[in-house]
Amino acid sequence: MALKKVKGNFFERMFDKNLTDLVRGIRNNKDNEAKYISTCIEEIKQELRQDNISVKCNAVAKLTYIQMLGYDISWAGFNIIEVMSSSRFTCKRIGYLAASQCFHPDSELLMLTTNMIRKDLNSQNQYDAGVALSGLSCFISPDLSRDLANDIMTLMSSTKPYLRMKAVLMMYKVFLRYPEALRPAFPKLKEKLEDPDPGVQSAAVNVICELARKNPKNYLPLAPIFFKLMTTSTNNWMLIKIIKLFGALTPLEPRLGKKLIEPLTNLIHSTSAMSLLYECINTVIAVLISISSGMPNHSASIQLCVQKLRILIEDSDQNLKYLGLLAMSKILKTHPKSVQAHKDLILACLDDKDESIRLRALDLLYGMVSKKNLMEIVKRLLGHMERAEGSAYRDELLYKVIEICAQSSYLYVTNFEWYLTVLVELIQLEAGSRHGRLIAEQLLDVAIRVPVVRQFAVNEMTNLLDTFTVSAQSNSMYEVLYAAAWIVGEFAGELEDAEKTLNILLRPRLLPGHIQGVYVQNVIKLFARLATTCLELQDLPGLVTLCDHVLDKLQHFNGSSDIEVQERANSACMLIEMLRNQLSTSTDAMAMDTTTEGGIPPLAIEIVQEMTLLFTGELIPVAPKAQRKVPLPDGLDLDEWINAPPPEDAASSSSSEHDKDELFVSATQAGTGADGGEKRRQSLELTPEQLERQRMARLIEQSNNPHYLKSTPTASGASNADQYDNIDDIPITELPLDMEGVAALRVGITKRSDKYLQEQQAAQGSKDGKKKHKKGKKSKKAKNKVAYNSSSESEGEPKPLHIVNTTLDMPEGVSMSDSEDKDGKYDPNDPHRALDIELDITEFEAPAVRSASKKSAADKENLKTPADLAGGGNAAKKDRKKDKDKDKERKVKREHRESKRERKEAAVQPVIDLIDADTPTPSPSHISATSNNNNTSTVLPDAPKHHKKKKNKEKTTDEAPDALATATGSSIIDVGGEEASEVASKVHKKKHKKEKSQRKEKKKASESASVSAIVSIGDYEQPLGISTPSKEIL
């Protein structure tokens, strides 16, 4: 019977599909893969219902592969747990593999796996425990971490290195899910740093380095152990981790950096591993940044790092080149001159085929700019922009050009005419750029901040408004028209020909609504400027002609589909019509007394003057934080609706397409007579001259549009001449350009900015020539003197021609502040935040400082009892009591600060001393001498009562009797008699007892220190008997 059952299972399994068959079937059914997989899933469900664990294991293996293809297998969670609990290792391994892919920390089925995983962790077979640790690391939850933390910590002490290594690595995941486990597990984790197995040691280093990545200050006392590992280990990957850790610890303790410079420099010289070299350079940079003020002779280390980074950048490997540029940018922040010497190499990286290399080189150029080389660098970038392929990289180049020039409030721009020319060139080069708004902001900012350059700016903006090509590509670049129109209107007094600029703004164009609105607004400014000129010249006919011309041109803005443009145009028309009506009466009343000498009515003059007052005054930039600093009035709720929105049902029932059309038509055709429907009817019946004018405008616009297919030229030249009678009115830059024309145009544009560069180079050359001439005269007199070059780079930089106004507009009574809300700086969901735990590393701590300070404070409190007896009246006693209370508070605070500082130095000082010693352990004689010279007591684990005998306490107890005697002496003078003598005798007895107890404690401390030091000879760790060394050793 049993044989028949075995045969049946064998024949059934012979036709089962294994994982190989599944993969082969999926490859053969590429056209209907989903259908084939659904069939396989049904077969797998049938296999999971069988009792044979091998069949279930095969089914789970196939489910694991199907899950990798993106299919959900969460429905098989119970079957996966069943396979995980198998006693066979092959099945258990497949089960844990499926669980690591299917389960996650929030899975509800994990509560069923706690006892099973604990059983595997405590198994005698190391591979069962190993596979359990590997799988658990993928789906461990806070509950599993809490329940299994002790079992995993037990494995850290296993006799098998395989399990110790996995347990150490697993503890990091436990710490993230259950931070409370860090404190009890840390002593064992620290022991593994000196484990004889290199794999376990490397795992412990990895875990501590990951823990210290976010909270490095908690692991500063472990620096001696890591220093020993760094100088003795040959494992490059472990060295990289240790060096990264030192890079995080150095800013917290700059003295540590001075000890690291020499070994790191040796590693840089000796290592051939590029990864280790890069980490060494990174750490040296961090060290030099933290100790730059205390280590003047570090230029050699910087030069070494820069030379090694140049080797990385010149390497053919793109990854090394990128890392070299990245590290070079870190050096640039603190030592820019060292990096500027390699400017040619950085500029050469702009031609690299890898875009990430080019972008990293652009970031470096931002910090290499000076007043002397700004124009040259911008010229190189403009040349790269012409040759660059891809709109994204061209946009990044444009952004970097503006960022380089505008940094630190235009610190390096010496000629703003050159900068405005560059901005105009960027507009013409990058018609389809997405940075049009950025260029517009720069144009506005320069025109507002630099008053001297405004005349040049308005002329450039007039040309830009006249020659800007409207195309489908320039959606974002339309914003420059916004800036140009605002500049010519705001600073209309700087215009050479305001009437020409007014005609340019009134020219009909297909522009976005907000651009048309700015056009209308600045037309009013220019009109007010020209009207004021007519008043000054007493030119009545010119003023009438101006009003008629502007009223006629503003009519096409009245028909705009943008409601803002309509409102502004109608308001402008009404205002100008009022002025026109007043001027029309002046011709009939020329002989009356109500007119002035030139015939302009006084009311018309008042209208022009009031219109001019609307735009008087100078605008300054608004501070970025101005709006948030405006106080809200009481009772104002910014979230409340001004007008409550109508209900959705009412809005849907009352609105329809027909109603929308009626509203739109009534808005455009409302009114009759001279201003209403009559003009609308006239626009529908165009004269032949108007039709011809519109046709010519349409042909010119089509010729300017590069996306419009032009008609082929005909053989008849006369017809072309007739067709383009107004050819002289077409601006040259709006002509359709082929590739050769574009190249020629770009060359001509680039020469405009090159003119300023040539002038700067010529001026710099003349200065250099004068310096050489003076130096040649002085060289004959100073033959025997030491040469000293007093000229610095800043002296050779050109002086700025213009002054930038940095005043910002703020609300009244509000001042600028740099305080920012930093609540969003750190992620509240970061698990490392919970791991910021102060660990009890007793090897370097001084726990007795706080208790000593408390006791000394209590002693000093006792000293005040004699003083309370002094004084004649209640008022004097109260005053003295208040003064003494204040003194007591100040002393307690001072002692608390001193104890806190001494405790911190006690934790850090052994780190530096042990690293500086270069020996595993100090000699017993040295230990004894140190403890005796510093008058410190030892810290023994079996004698906790001595923990409070520290230097701070002894100093307090030594000084307290003297202070007490002084205070008592003064009290004796005041009190006098028997009461004073009793107080003095008590003080002398107390002082004698304290001195006797201190001598006994010092003797015991020196003996225990010698014994503990002798016991711990040969270990690198500092013995427990060693007290904190004094600062004099350092």
UniProtKB/Swiss-Prot annotation:
Low complexity compositional bias, start-end: 928-942, 1007-1016
InterPro entries xrefs: AP3_complex_dsu, AP3D_dom_metazoa, ARM-like, ARM-type_fold, Clathrin/coatomer_adapt-like_N
Keywords: Cytoplasmic vesicle, Golgi apparatus, Membrane, Phosphoprotein, Protein transport, Repeat, Transport
Ranges in a coiled coil: none
SUPFAM superfamilies on file: ARM repeat
Record's compositionally biased regions (Basic and acidic residues): 822-836, 882-906
Annotated Basic residues bias: 769-784, 986-1003
Modified residues (Phosphoserine): 683
Chain intervals for the UniProt region annotation (Disordered): 637-660, 669-688, 701-723, 758-1034
Record GO terms (molecular function): cargo adaptor activity
A GO term from the CC aspect: endoplasmic reticulum
HEAT repeats: 35-72, 143-180, 181-217, 219-255, 258-297, 299-337, 338-374, 376-414, 415-452, 570-609
Composition skew (Polar residues), residue ranges: 1025-1034
Phosphothreonine: residues carrying this PTM: 687
Localization: Cytoplasmic vesicle, Clathrin-coated vesicle membrane; Golgi apparatus
Membrane topology qualifier: Peripheral membrane protein
Pfam family, one: Adaptin_N
One annotated GO biological process: exocytosis
Superkingdom, natural source: Eukaryota
The family this protein is said to belong to: Belongs to the adaptor complexes large subunit family.
PANTHER family: AP-3 COMPLEX SUBUNIT DELTA-1 (PTHR22781:SF12), DELTA ADAPTIN-RELATED (PTHR22781)
Subunit structure: Adaptor protein complex 3 (AP-3) is a heterotetramer composed of two large chains (delta and beta3), a medium chain (mu3) and a small chain (sigma3).
Function, as annotated: Part of the AP-3 complex, an adapter-related complex which is not clathrin-associated. The complex is associated with the Golgi region as well as more peripheral structures. It facilitates the budding of vesicles from the Golgi membrane and may be directly involved in trafficking to lysosomes.
Protein name: AP-3 complex subunit delta
Lineage of source species: Eukaryota, Metazoa, Ecdysozoa, Arthropoda, Hexapoda
Gene giving rise to this polypeptide: g
